[in-house]
Amino acid sequence: MSYNSIRLPQDLPIYYKNFFPVKPFTKWLRYGQNNGDYFNRREFAFILADDVHIRYRSYNDEHAFFKALSSTNPEKLDIGAVYNHEPINNKRHTDYQAVERELVFDIDLTDYDPVRNCCKDATVCPKCWKFMVLAVKILDFQLEDMFDFKARMWVFSGRRGVHCWVGDKKARMLNNYQRSAIATRLNLFKKNGQCEVTEGRAKMTKVPPIVRDAFNVALKDGVFEKMIYDQGWLDKEDFITEYKFMSEVGRDDLRSLSETYKTPQERWNMIRGLFDDDYRKSLSPKDGLLDFKMQGRDRNYLLYFVLQRCYPRLDVNVSTGTNHLLKSPFCIHPKTGNVAVPLNVGKIEEFDVSKCPRIDHVVEELSSLLAERGNDENEDSKNRKFLAYKHGALAPYVENFEKFVSACIS
């Protein structure tokens, strides 16, 4: 049964008071510094019912932040930049400006609608989630390999997308120009929604490392092959004409072979046999594909076929502005009731969107969690403050979050 948003006014106060992980949250946004020197210059925005925005909120410490959060109970919480003055006093300063902010990325499933056949718009199913699995794996690899960013957190938005927060100091100190340069370099969708897998002059066939690495990550664990069958990409013969740089000779070869290789599984093996040099090494003459040798840009067909479908489709504007607001981890999506939970990249394929912690289910756990604590005979446990977010459905996601926080301040 889907979430009834009428419940939000009764669920939010219980959730914020008992389950929002305020201690690790404020520890993260302090980055090891004293409250009065840093945390108090961070902007928070509370979004209330009817999309009422309260911006430029700032707080001296964890206690003040939690008091405001648990008394206001916003439907959504956004995190902004660190400014040179306290945001709450922004109108007092003519030089008020953002000076620091995590590097962030936003990937939305609706941007995959041109290649997503199982669902459309805001609907998400397990087949859809594979798009996010590969997008996260590819971009996470690139952020470490290309830029040596270590503190990376991936958060399910609560409905149909994921957000990435990069907390390394060198990432937080980037200016807008540098952020734009990174986002532009990582974005392969430059014109007309087409993924560019080569660079240089029109007739050149140079494949940059970013493309080759993304391709290798995409094919590593077999997720992409499952997507081929889930989405029906090889059921029809559209795949023959989709690559605009393919020569007529190359198209004729594909068309001819597709009459022999008719099932999606056969066609996938055929395509790899024609365009994947490593895969070709495993073929024998009897397979009939070694007689075909693609030339020029035809050789890049498989790169395009794969990355057009699974390369991260970034909302570049989210990444370029230091002062951009982004939805906080552990806030609630008001329409689905889902908690925006940090993900474990190593286990991202196991994440089931339909089983994401939902606010009504989370708050309903409280009585049983308190009862379990009451039955605990360990006196030390009883004397410690009970942190409900350390127990129940949210616990593994809080653990993911705390690992990110540790990476940020180490």
From Swiss-Prot:
Keywords: DNA replication, DNA-directed RNA polymerase, Metal-binding, Nucleotidyltransferase, Primosome, Transcription, Transferase, Zinc
Gene Ontology BP annotations: DNA replication, synthesis of primer
GO MF terms, alphabetically ordered: DNA-directed RNA polymerase activity; metal ion binding
InterPro entries: DNA_primase_S, DNA_primase_ssu_euk/arc
Note: The bound zinc ion is not a cofactor. It is bound to a zinc knuckle motif that may be involved in sequence recognition and the binding of ssDNA.
UniProt cross-references to PANTHER family, sorted A to Z: DNA PRIMASE SMALL SUBUNIT
Complex formation: Heterodimer of a small subunit and a large subunit.
Name the record gives this protein: DNA primase small subunit
Species: Caenorhabditis elegans
Gene designation: pri-1
